[in-house]
Amino acid sequence: MSEGTNYTPSQQAVIAQQGNNLLVSASAGSGKTTVLIERIMRKILAGTNIDQLLVVTFTNLAAKHMKQKLESQINKRISQLMTDNPAQTTASPAIRQLRQQLNLLGVANISTLDAFCLRVIQRYYYVIDLDPVFRLLTDNTEGLLIRDQVWDSVREQLYDEDGTLFDLLTANFSNDRSDDGLSRLIFRLFDFAQSTPDPEGWLSKLPEPYQVDEEALTASAFYQQQLLPLLINEVDGMQMKLRQAQKVATDADLVPKTLEVLATAQKTLTTLREQLATASWNELRTQVATFKIGALKKTYKDEPEKTARAKTMGTFVDGVKKQMTTLSETYFAADEQQVLDIMVGAKSIVTELVDATKQFKTAFAAEKRRRHVLDFSDLEHLTLQILTSDNESSQAALAQLRAQFEEVMVDEYQDINSLQESILQLLARDQPGNMFMVGDVKQSIYQFRLADPLLFLHKYHDFGTNPEHGERIVLAENFRSVANVDHLTNLIFSQLMDAPVGQIDYDEAAYLKYGPKDYPADMPQTTNLLLYQTETDKSTEDVSTDETNFSIDDPAVGSITMVAQKILALKAQDKPIYERANGEYRPFRYSDVALLVPTRNHNLTIIDVFKRYHIPVVVNDAQNYFQTTEIRIMMALLSIIDNPYQDIPLVAVLRSPIVGLDENQLVYLRIQNKTSDYFQAVQDFYHHYPTGPATEYGDQVYAKIETFLTQLTEFRDLARRNQIVTLIWQIYERTGFLDYVGGMPAGKQRQANLHALYERAYTYEQGSFKGLFQFVRFIRRMQEKDQDLAAAVAETDAEAVNVMTIHGSKGLEYPVIFVMDMDKQFNQTDTRSSALLDREAGIGITYLDPETRVKYPTLPQVVTKQVVSKKMRAEEMRKLYVAMTRAQQQLYLVGTIKDIDTATEKWRQAFASDGRVLSAQARIAATNQLDWVGMAVMRHPAMKAYWGDEWPNYELTDDPTKLAVELGDATTVLAEQSEAVTDTQPDALELVEQQVTIDVDQVTRDYLTTLLNFHYPHQASTTTTAYQSVSEVKRIFEDPDTPLMNANPTVSQRRSRPTSRFVTGSLELPQFLQTTQAPTSAEVGSATHLVLEQLDLTKPVNETTVQSTIDGLVANRVLTTNVAKLIAVDTIVAFYQSALGSQILDNPAKVHREVPFSLLIPARQIFDVDEHETGKVLIHGIIDGYLETADGLTLFDYKTDHVKRPEDLKTRYAGQVKLYAAALASMYPGKVTKQYLYSLPQQVFVPVN
């Protein structure tokens, strides 16, 4: 919604409301941020200072943007006041008040709740006797390390103190290999507890459901309060199915016997329901086990319609039977005594688990206090403690904060938890209420962060029925999307989302209302289902893929290819995107598109397919950081530095570019020793090969292994004596690996990843954690927990398709949205664990009988699983809502099916529902979002082609949604692929051979002849460069008579001849590919020049001072020891004992060393170009030195070459020195009087005329 838009009545109400609490339910695209900013502006204009408002945002970025928008609005208001009344000055009260708000904006309480809590603690730390000197753990890594360290200590203590009981606890949640299962559970339980206002109290209540004492099971509080409602719901569901079966049978006039059977079954269910609250467990178990439905007539001869209706009726009846079987196997699998025995044993386990968690909680807090650190959870708990402590200081602090804030404003209210709610409620006033809460519970998708959308829902219902508690206003207008996106969203969610299954009623108030006034009425409005079929009766044998070398062997590839082809089709359209800013249609841009994925599993496939279609793409977190090649290699190397006797990481390093062995060479090593571990085989080869028969192949392997083992020994020594960060950086430097990955595809990203590993090691050691073994172990734990290192920022192409998770898309919008992988199965991991957690239901565990070693599900686990499953489905619905409402103009729902007939047959179960909302059974039975969407659209008239002989009980005849279904399979997708390649990449030879006949007049013919016969007058210059270094062109001066090019090259020679640039004949191998460490003469020469440059000329130059200079360069790691020891110290001393050297030492202020220069000279002096060529070449270089004397400038150039005669230096380098002299002459005309080459090995000067 643009800022200039007139506010709707509901928006005006939100902006103007005051005098009570206000809950704003803001649907997607309803302009809630704009409304929130305007509400703040109204309060400022009414006299409230901005620091009198507490504005809580969900992220730091949101807070930053809000401040920026407020600053912009305040400045606009100031400009408006001065424009409306030019006589008004900046000293006027209104403008002065607004300028004051700009000054206060920097200290305004517009931030996340964590940031606000930090300010409260820093202000009122004395209330709870907190040491004010603390550090915030902004990096989660250090917190995890401390947590692991503390738990290791607590666990050892529990093993010693609790003995058998703790052993039973460990066995219940771990396995024979490790007790990591218990560790993970302790941490999960701790995190859950920390999200509540009273962690200790919440933990203490966890064993209560297992408390049955001596009373009957069905009389226990657990049964009556938690299990009974679930059983009633199950029976109610079966009765509803039977009523639907009875209605079908009655309407179709089926045989009376059928109606009798159904009535009997219904009566049995009614009796069961009545007895659920009062009968004993064993009585209920018997009734459930013996429930039966009599035989029903399924076919009616010569009456196909009755047969069809009987089939529909049978579907309902089969559903009842299946549900009753599940009830028997899930709830009533054991008799009462068995259940009680299991509950008693499980209670002791849960009690011990709670005690262990409390001990860990206490020890963790103590360790953080000892280290003077706090984490984000501490901020909220300490703030709550400050506000609720039973002392005068606490009461005074609370009173001050309440008095300070005229209003408490909470953005994204649906994503807070009960702890945060407690803090906000304390800060708010009671009479009148001053809380402003805005959000959309339909977009609450952060359950994994322990957000609690039920808090929003409770207030929504409470304010609706008790207006004295607060007001509620719904912002239903969607100003983001075209009408059809709203229609499809309403069509789907009005059938899917209700309180029993989705936690929320998607009623008329929740419907998206079309808000924009600027979209053209004739704008295309179709939304699409893109369905890739994996099994059809078509064959791919007739499709030639030779041109593409491409096949589809993965359903994900098929659906992604369909999307790529759709994007290309959009690209080919003439201006398909409407630009609302200027009211015109414009061409399609790749950045108009976002692909929303449920997980990152197929991101690499997206990159691969899109690359094939030349579609630029930006993928956030294309793969897990730990799975990138460079990080896996580094982690493998660190692992074997810690312990080389690990086959997998060892082979990974040997195969990597650091060593460079190929598969055959790895096999060759293993053949040398087939029985021992691989490192022993490597060592055996290294020690035995030199004494055996040598081969060229073996020599190659030996050279690499020798280098590797040398480096490994050095690295292991470094690891013992240095920090991890030093080790990692030395690995980068000595192997050249950091430079190597920079040359790989996405090199900058890979280098950033390696730098991130270095930074992570630095953070690790800053937290007082030491040791390579512990660091490697920590990284492995991070991988096991699916915790990633800080993502390194990669460069992105702004003009590219965006790929992101649905969570990552929240708050964003794009003209074209593809919701991907809708057939992905819901994640059931949380329901399969041996311990299920829920804030309300508590904990449900699987119990391991210590005698029989058999695991039994407990009834609290059954209850908790139902609660967790319901919340999971509700969150999946909300994720789908978020994904669909990101679309502005075009929306595509993408999924994979077996074939359309099979899919629509499954989706037609929606026909049995009598009302708009689909039956709970059908929605709960769905295993992915595509089935939800399929059932919801199935009753729409657009899908009539797939109805077959069936007809929905409730038809959506008046729904305005425009829907299209596009089907694809391997045949059609490959065919379109072939056409796309043929269209966009025609064969070059084919184009050349095309015969084109045209008529041209003589004038055109003469003009074309002139063009074809044109000769560029500076053709020779196109084969030269405009930039050269002295070292590159020095050969031209060795023999000026030697032509660089043939005088009259042939056409073929012109085509094949490279550009004239004089360079060295080869490039140095990277360090990790070198097999020797011996310094080259060039390296020694460069080092000698460096020493000559660094010598202090104000002191005597002798062997001691020269060696001291060399030692200093080695100490500073400018020179290596291997190079330094080869520098001829005596030759340097000899230079300064010469006449010129003595003159230099006598006038150190007059000598200039290592002087860089640039010089423009005519190209014809260097290259074989036309003498009339006027182009010039830029020469750059560095002059070794020159001395200012009374007679002029004396130029000298050191040489370390070993030559037979000094004159050879003159032959080789005279031209180079002449260039130096020309450069000096251009700076000091007429002053260069002497030019010398000095041979350091022969200790003689060679004059250059």
From Swiss-Prot:
InterPro entries: AddA, DNA_helicase_UvrD-like_C, DNA_helicase_UvrD/REP, P-loop_NTPase, PDDEXK-like_dom_sf, PDDEXK_AddAB-type, Restrct_endonuc-II-like, UvrD-like_ATP-bd. NCBIfam families: addA_Gpos. This is ATP-dependent helicase/nuclease subunit A. Coiled coil: none annotated. The keyword Flavoprotein does not apply. SUPFAM superfamilies: P-loop containing nucleoside triphosphate hydrolases (SSF52540), Restriction endonuclease-like (SSF52980). The gene is addA. One of its GO terms (cellular component) is cytosol. Residues 5-482 form the UvrD-like helicase ATP-binding domain. The heterodimer acts as both an ATP-dependent DNA helicase and an ATP-dependent, dual-direction single-stranded exonuclease. Recognizes the chi site generating a DNA molecule suitable for the initiation of homologous recombination. The AddA nuclease domain is required for chi fragment generation; this subunit has the helicase and 3' -> 5' nuclease activities. PANTHER family: ATP-DEPENDENT HELICASE_NUCLEASE SUBUNIT A, UVRD / RECB / PCRA DNA HELICASE FAMILY MEMBER. Residues 521-811 form the UvrD-like helicase C-terminal domain. It comes from the Bacteria. ATP binds at A26, S27, A28, G29, S30, G31, K32, T33. It catalyses: Couples ATP hydrolysis with the unwinding of duplex DNA by translocating in the 3'-5' direction; ATP + H2O = ADP + phosphate + H(+). The lineage of its organism: Bacteria, Bacillati, Bacillota, Bacilli, Lactobacillales. Pfam families: PDDEXK_1 (PF12705), UvrD-helicase (PF00580), UvrD_C (PF13361). Its cofactor is Mg(2+). Heterodimer of AddA and AddB/RexB. Its EC number is 3.1.-.-, 5.6.2.4.
